[in-house]
A protein has these predicted regions:
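Acidic donor-binding/catalytic loop of UDP-sugar-dependent glycosyltransferases
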Residues: 187-190, 196-213
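Acidic donor-binding loop at a coil-to-helix junction in glycosyltransferase catalytic cores
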Residues: 301-307
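Terminal low-complexity segments of carbohydrate-biosynthetic enzymes
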Residues: 1-11, 351-490
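A recurrent flexible, glycine/aromatic-enriched loop bordering the glycosyltransferase active site
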Residues: 259-284
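Active-site-proximal specificity loops/subdomain of glycosyltransferases
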Residues: 23, 90-190
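Short beta-strand-to-loop element that shapes/binds the nucleotide-sugar donor at the catalytic cleft/hinge
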Residues: 209, 221-242
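Short, acidic, metal-binding catalytic loop of nucleotide-sugar glycosyltransferases
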Residues: 39, 62-74, 83-86, 112, ...
Length: 490
């Protein structure tokens, strides 16, 4: 009996249809396509957004040409050169220095993008130019020598930019993603759509290890790799770089701590596996499942994390430690958020002589997890009896955040959080409150200095068998303990 005989459609066919619908929605026929068809042997398409990145993108492309264990027929790169039509508007609570930096980047990027488009054209046309730097010429020669396919999507020139509301990093990623999925549909393969950033260097075995991860784990619909920041000494001195590196390790570990607490409370009899967090420099998913998650959110910051949340709701996303990338930790205002903006803020704090880095309080995390059930019930009662008001919701949070008679919250931050919370649909909030909103609340409350929080987090995580028995989290614990023990003032 055929699969269609009894009215059942095979899963693969359903996914294909979803992929076609996604492409139709996000890549209208009026959009100019890549002129070269996808190689029938291609299994991975790498999407790279580039907004004013001439200085860095050829570092990435050179590393792409130096990949080991893969043939050039197995992969391609799609570089989405993009910029908005108009200068950015100032965001709510955005520091003046950050906004000014984003405006300056916009002005530089428009010219920079045209230069990048011209240089990238040399890869396919073979034309020589005296305007190339030595590094650019070397990268182009490597790409040609190894037969690497680099395709260009021009969303920077007049009349070609993305619509203003999606002319951002998420919009650029999604534009490249839609074309990559369409190309895989044309060769009838549910290939891999991978993402990285234009300032990132790929480990020589990155693509091979990423592809192998999907082969070993057919149950995985997404894979994220290891991200190791490289030091741009023009941006940060050694001590500030060390602080940012410690902060990155801390964020990864406290996220794992939240996962473990949640697992202990809700799934104590199941095996513990960290759900990998997707990050822009190293995230990937199967093409049709990417479409199932509706692609990359078209937002100016946090598109990678939001994509991961969407993808995780569709299936398993795993961490592959051997798929390593090296982004530059540098000053950058190309996106509305991210590490580049964080560097700008850190340098400003350093000039002012204030507390450099504060972080989420690990002491509060387990307190919150223990109170989630009571909190959800209380909020439901408030909604049913008083309505969804800042006053009613605020009282619940004030109770939650008072521990042993001591308030552990910042009054202004709490009011701001609650006012934003009640603007959302209450039923959706209550449905997701089990963990998501509590974590958001924790991050908005009193934040200790990094050097005070690290010992507390290490003590708590090292006492949890779930984390110590997991290879990924144990490596994080060891790394944070080792790096925090090095000389320096955190």
């Amino acid at each position: 009996m055929s699969a269609r005989y009894d009215g059942m459609i095979p899963e693969e066919e359903r996914l294909k249809e979803t992929a076609r619908e996604y492409v139709e929605k996000h890549l209208p026929q009026t959009e100019e396509r890549i002129g070269i068809p996808m190689d029938p042997a291609c299994v991975l398409s790498l999407v790279i957004p580039a907004y004013g990145e001439r200085e860095h993108v050829f570092r990435l492309l050179a590393s792409l040409a130096e990949q080991r264990g893969t043939s050039p027929e197995e992969f391609e790169a799609i570089v989405v050169v993009n910029n908005p039509t108009h200068a950015p508007t100032r965001l709510e609570n955005e520091p003046e220095t950050v906004y000014r930096s984003r405006c300056e980047h916009f002005l530089r990027a428009r010219q920079d993008n045209q230069e990048t488009l011209s240089i990238l054209a040399h890869i396919t046309t073979g034309a020589a130019s005296s305007d190339l730097s030595d590094d650019e010429r070397e990268a182009i020669d490597l790409l040609k020598e190894h037969g690497v396919k680099v395709h260009i999507v021009d969303k920077a020139s007049d009349g070609k930019t993305l619509p203003e509301e999606v002319a951002n990093v998420g919009g650029a990623r999604n534009r490249g993603t839609a074309e990559a999925i369409e190309r895989f549909l044309e060769i009838d393969r549910n290939g891999i759509v991978a993402h990285t950033d234009a300032d990132t260097r790929l480990d020589p075995d990155y693509l091979r290890n990423l592809i192998d991860a999907y082969t070993r784990r057919p149950d995985a619909i997404g894979v994220t790799g290891e991200v190791i920041m490289e030091h741009d000494k023009d941006a940060l001195d050694d001590e500030l770089f060390r602080l940012k590196h410690l902060q990155g390790l801390y964020k990864k570990l406290i996220l794992a701590y939240h996962h473990a607490l949640f697992h202990q409370r809700s799934r104590p009899h199941e095996s513990f596996e960290m759900q990998a967090k997707t990050v822009g420099p190293s995230m990937s998913a199967r093409a049709y499942q990417t479409a199932l998650a509706d692609g990359i959110p078209t937002v100016g910051k946090g598109e990678d994390t939001r994509f991961g949340e969407r993808l995780s709701s569709c299936g398993k996303v795993i961490f592959e430690p051997s798929a390593v990338v090296y982004p530059l930790l540098r000053v950058s205002s190309r996106a509305e958020g991210g590490s580049g903006i964080g560097v700008i803020k850190l340098r400003e704090k350093n000039k002012e002589g204030g507390q450099l880095i504060t972080v989420e309080n690990p002491v509060l995390a387990d307190v919150f997890e223990r109170r989630i059930t009571d909190l959800t019930t209380a909020l439901q009662h408030v909604f049913e009896t008083q309505g969804w008001t800042p006053e009613g919701v605020g009282v619940i949070f004030e109770h939650l955040l008072t521990i042993d008679g001591r308030k552990v919250y910042n009054e202004e931050k709490l009011q701001h959080f609650v006012s934003r919370l009640v603007k959302n649909d209450p039923q959706e909030v209550l449905a997701s409150f089990d963990r998501f909103w509590v974590v958001k609340a924790v991050r908005r409350m009193t934040r200790p200095p990094l050097h005070q929080a690290i010992p507390d987090l290490l003590e708590k995580t090292k006492s949890m068998p779930l984390l110590m028995e997991n290879e990924y989290t144990r490596t994080l614990i060891d790394s944070l303990e080792r790096e925090a023990g090095k000389p320096g003032d955190t």
